[in-house]
Every structure is written in structure tokens, then in C-alpha cells.
């Protein structure tokens, strides 16, 4: 990268998460200079239906970006990158929002990633055993786009399906709004739509599942022009978008990433040299990036394709060009912790106590656990309390939407101690789920020696330590906590031409903050917890079988 001495260089990263838009100004060293966040609306008209508005999201992107760049010389801003959740955006033939609901509310034109309305449709898709399913862990998830498209065709044919003109993954919608070019990203199409880099779309798949009309016009509705993440799209930032965002016209705009993949990009390239960590020279393929927020995604990369049952992929060049990606995940993690804590009868007491001390509720709970642990490790407080965390189905490695949450060991207690212990057991369950995914990936051929954590839950020291203790692996935290935003900015840096490749940009812009090591003396305890954890799963399947015989 060529740069004049003293010249300021910045990239803008825009991250559209589940509940908010965040924008950061990031320099060429990966330092977040400024960032602003704004919430976005979520509608839940009925259980398992989650909807958003593309107009609302774009307006938030514009408002927040203007705030972030307001004090900077536009000439210093060299590239723009987007990431977003893998939600489905529906537009009509005039590129206007089209309702994805029976109420006809056109503003609500997004089926969110966590929407599970298409359960029947995904079951039928999986029964086809089509060859494309081999690249999604053998079983397609209800959170992917084909079952959602099929649901729209079968439930809103006249109102929505027949009127649709463009069907975007949210990250691609954002780059279209910025550039006027509806080119899609390899990341979105490969990971969520069954696109193959080698063969493109598979006509036989869409025809077999009843979506033969998707093939019309050379797949014009879902994308027939595709680019690698970080490549500069079209004619760059349009005059209209530049005015709305407060950025210079003609600014390079990168092909996008899904938010979890941006997190992986922002954290997994950080060098471990000089940290005294065993295996510091191990390749990037020995690292598992864990992006943990509302849900969690587990990103493992390899030089050759590895097929892992129940784990999405292998996807070629979906995150890092030239490397294969496997993506495990848990559909509810941060959302699960909130659900458990907010639903406890002692929650009001917790809120009052935390407020009186000027603390966040989770900071207070962590401190409270330290107070009640007595002489043993904190984790041992949950020796008799066990949680199976699939309150929103199992994404990996069971790939089973029918799985439900379980709690074993409840008492009549209404105390704050009881709430704190349940909170601890829930975090342990999430970490045990990570171990389950990790061991499945290892068995299939991955060799993981280090976890790299980012996302909102990585700010919680208890969550981080439990992942280290339960997996037995060191956990690397990024110097920049907001690694997803850094990942989006890395895309912009690549689009600008300042870096010749994503790999080089990752190495320069990703930095280690600290490393958390496991308490190996607690291994026997967590091995026993893991044994119970696996029994909870097998027992639940037994219960389903018993009740299914009625």
C-alpha cells in the first residue's frame, strides 16, 4: 500500500446486525477511530415469523454513516464495505419493497435470518437428498433462502411471489443501494442459496423443489453476476447514495460478506507471534473463529474441502479467497441468555441491584457468582444444574429444527443466587455446544488448536473463560473488540486497491488483544458436564420417539 507520510487513510465499515446498524471509521492499521450505532425495527407478527424493513435499514445506514464521517476530509476515505445478516429482501419489478406477510405491509419486506416459518418447506427440500445438500452439511437449514422462497410461493403467491422482481440477501441489497449494481457476493450465494463457484446454479435443484420459475431469465431474480468479497463493484458509489451516506461519489464499494463471515475476516488473521502460545506458527487453518452475538457462528477454514455432517459447507472462497469454509452455529446464544435471565422471577431484583451499583446486569451477575462461589471455581456452582441450549432448534451439529431447550435441576428457589446459577449453567451449555461442534469438525478432518472470539458475547469474561475451560483451548480476543466492523472495513480496503488481497489486509488490520487460557485443573469437571450434555440430547430424542408413538 502506497501512502504519503502523514496522510490519513480511512475505510468505512457498515455492519447490519440483527437489531442495529453499526458504522465504523477504520484506519489502515485496523484501528477503529470512531463508531456509531442505531437500532432497527423488528416485527414478530406471530411465533417464528421475524420481519424487517429494507427502507428502515437503509435509512439507518445513511444516518449513522453521516455521523461517523462528519469530521473527516472525504479525500481521506478510500473504500466502503458492507456486511449484514443473511436475511431475505424482497423487491418488486420496480425495485420497491414487497410485503412478505399476509397483512400486505410492504414496508415489512424482509424475512429475517432467524425466521423459522418455512419448517415444512425445508423438510420437503431435505427429503429430496439432492446433491447440493452435500455442501450444507447434508441437511439444509430453515435459516437458508430456498425454504423461505418456497414458503413465499406457497403462501403468498399472488400477493408477493408473482410480483417479485429481485430477491436479495441483505448484504447484496446494501451494495445494490450503494452502487445501483445488483451483482451478488460469492459469500451470500454460496453459503445461503446453493450457488457453486465451479458450476453456478443447479437447475435440477430448483426444479425438484418446486421453484423452477427461479431459473427464468438466467436467474435474474436471484443473481447471475457474482463477485468475490472485497472486489470493487460496478461504477462504485452513486451520486444518490453518496449524498445519502455523506460519502464521496465514486468511492469504491466492495462485494459484501454475511456478518459472521466479516467477523471471521476481522479476527482470524491476527498473528500470534510473540505471545508465547504453543503452536504460534500454526497456519490459519488451525483456528476456529467464533462470532457470538444474538446467535453464534463457528468458522473453520481448510485448504481442501472437508465435509462435516450437520455443519454448513464446505464453501469455497466464501470468506477467504482460495480457502474452504465450514460454518457451524447455534441459532440462539445472546438471545438465549437474555431470554433465561429476563424470564426469571428474580430479574427485577437483579435490575434494581445492578442499577444501584451503576453496573450492567451481566457484570453484576458475574460479580455475584464470584461472591457465592466460596472456595471452589465459579463453574462448579452449576454441578447440579444442566441446560440443553436449543431453545430455537439445533443448527449444528445435529441440524435438527425439532430440538427444544431443556433445564434439569430446578428447585423452588426464587433467589438472585438461583438466577445467577441458571445464567452460569446457560453459558456453560452454549460453550458445551461449541465443544460439540468443535469435536464434530475435528472428527471430520479439521485440526483446531485455537479459538478466536469476537462479537458482543466476547465482551463477557465469564462467557470467554467458559469457552476456554470447556473446550480446553486458548481463546484469542482481538485488540479491536468490534471485529465485525473491522472485517467490513477490510472489504473496503481491498476494494480501494490499497491491499493486493484480503489475506494481506487481514494480516495488517487484525491485531491480538489478549489470550485467555483454559484452567486445565477443571477438565474432569467439564468432561462430566459434557457427558451429561450429550445425554440430554439423546434423552430428548427418546422422549420424542415415545410421544410419537401415540
Swiss-Prot record:
Species whose genome carries this gene: Xenopus laevis (African clawed frog)
Disulfide bonds listed in the record: none
Alphabetized Pfam families for the sequence: FGGY_C, FGGY_N
Record key words, sorted: Kinase, Transferase
Gene transcribed to yield this protein: fggy
Protein name: FGGY carbohydrate kinase domain-containing protein
This enzyme's EC code(s): 2.7.1.-
Cellular component annotations (GO), alphabetically ordered: cytoplasm
Gene Ontology biological-process entries: pentose metabolic process
Domain of life (superkingdom): Eukaryota
Homology family: Belongs to the FGGY kinase family.
MF GO annotations: D-ribulokinase activity
